């Protein structure tokens, strides 16, 4: 049997977790031929085909591939744990973090600033994406700790509720919308009537909205969507410019509501809430600094102090 390398296992796991050769190559910054070559070498070493190759964008595991995947993932996790086992504060690498848009912009910076005051040697990198992308970063080992607004993989991921957020319908502060506010209109009454600026698919905000619409017997396709935008700041500019209304986190529009630029309608009589979660991989052993950060964030009074300083 030929030797098996960690690089081969890393690429194999990436193809599985990203769902195809093309996406794995993009995420690992390799070309597709490099990814294919490493997979071929791994298959030669094992003497088995690991993927059913219908096309390069979407692949599925063979029976043998399904047996190899959990072992390969465990080996990569153990190697990551070994790298941090004897690291001290001075030589410890930066903690790799990932956050979806809303927590990454409006919540996590305050948490990290508070933790940095407590642990001056703390160093971190913060990657941004939607909730689905952050889950993929976690599973592929690109980050150790994540912050998301949606639950998608409870069998593999530990979710700790950090913050109870609520979604509101944001509208331009003009006479038309002020009259509707005075009449006690809820945001759900405007969803089907007004031009709508939507968050991108895969975001926690979009997932929460689609779940809510289903409870009403509605779908996202029934909204008059004029644009899909992946940045709440850009969406607020569009709403301020009169393009349409939008469903956003109350955190995202707090300042604009206070200064009178935007109005925030409650979506329904019962506020539409969603939870911001701290996530870690169940199978991964955290480094000492990563564990310190997680323990800090799980302390309610420490979080409250950090939120008050945001």
For each feature predicted by the language model, list its residue ranges.
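Flexible hinge/capping segments at coil-to-helix
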Residues: 157-197, 201
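Central regulatory/effector-binding core of bacterial HTH transcription factors
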Residues: 92-155
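Alpha-helical linker/hinge and terminal dimerization helices associated
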Residues: 45-46, 68-89, 304
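A short LG(V/I)-centered, amphipathic sequence patch enriched
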Residues: 43-61
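Short helix-boundary/capping micro-motifs
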Residues: 13-31
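Hydrophobic hinge/microswitch elements
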Residues: 130-134, 139-143, 148-149, 211-214, ...
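Secondary-structure junction motif
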Residues: 178, 187, 194-217, 286-290, ...
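A late-sequence structural motif
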Residues: 107, 263-307
């Amino acid at each position: 049997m030929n030797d098996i390398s960690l690089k081969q296992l890393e690429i194999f796991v990436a193809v599985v977790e990203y769902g195809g050769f093309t996406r794995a190559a993009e995420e690992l910054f390799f070309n597709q031929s490099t990814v294919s070559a490493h997979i071929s070498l791994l298959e030669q070493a094992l003497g088995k085909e690991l993927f059913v190759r219908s096309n390069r964008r979407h692949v599925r595991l063979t029976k043998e591939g399904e047996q190899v995947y959990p072992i390969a993932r465990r080996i990569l996790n153990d190697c990551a744990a070994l790298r941090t086992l004897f690291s001290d504060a001075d030589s410890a690498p930066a903690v790799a973090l990932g956050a979806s848009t809303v927590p990454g912009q409006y919540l996590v910076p305050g948490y990290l600033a508070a933790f940095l005051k407590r642990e001056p040697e703390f160093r971190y990198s913060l990657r941004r994406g939607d909730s689905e992308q952050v889950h993929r970063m976690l599973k592929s080992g690109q980050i150790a700790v994540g912050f998301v607004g949606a639950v998608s993989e409870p069998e593999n991921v530990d979710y700790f509720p950090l913050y109870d957020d609520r979604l509101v319908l944001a509208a331009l502060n003009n006479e038309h919308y002020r009259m509707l506010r005075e009449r006690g209109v809820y945001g759900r009454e405007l969803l089907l009537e007004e031009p709508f600026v939507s968050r991108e698919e895969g975001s926690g905000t979009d997932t929460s909205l689609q779940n809510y619409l289903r409870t009403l017997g509605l779908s996202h396709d029934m909204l008059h969507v004029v644009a899909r935008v992946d940045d709440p700041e850009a969406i607020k500019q569009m709403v301020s410019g009169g393009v349409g209304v939008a469903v956003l986190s109350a955190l995202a529009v707090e300042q604009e509501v206070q200064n009178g630029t935007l109005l925030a309608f409650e979506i329904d009589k019962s506020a539409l809430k969603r939870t911001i979660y701290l996530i870690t991989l169940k199978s991964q052993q955290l480094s000492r600094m990563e564990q310190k950060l997680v323990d800090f964030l799980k302390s309610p009074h420490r979080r409250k102090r950090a939120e008050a300083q945001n």
